[in-house]
Amino acid sequence: LDLERMKTVLQDEAEIDQRIYTFPTSSIEEGGKKISYFDYISSLKNPDCNEALKRVCSRIDLDAIHNFLEGVPELLPIQREFYLTMLTERKEKILDYSLKLLMEQEQHTSPMLGM
């Protein structure tokens, strides 16, 4: 995106959400159609993906990402804000949301301890 488009996206939650839920799409196809990351990950239908979700979520350090972006002198402030916003929103709305669903699913399907 050009700088003006980045500003527009950052000012509109619907634009941000479109970049989370609608595109980009993954290279994974179902029924000949590329699927969204959100739909695939939050479906919890792939056990390998679910295990990767558990491993990855705890390792994402948004502060470290912020510090990294701050250290790239070629980036303009609007670019830093855009990238950090998109990464933060995608983590929260795709990964954290899906992990919460997974934890709830596992809690309901595993036998209660101590009974």
Regions found by a protein language model. Give the residues of each.
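C-terminal catalytic region of ATP-dependent kinase domains
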Residues: 1-115
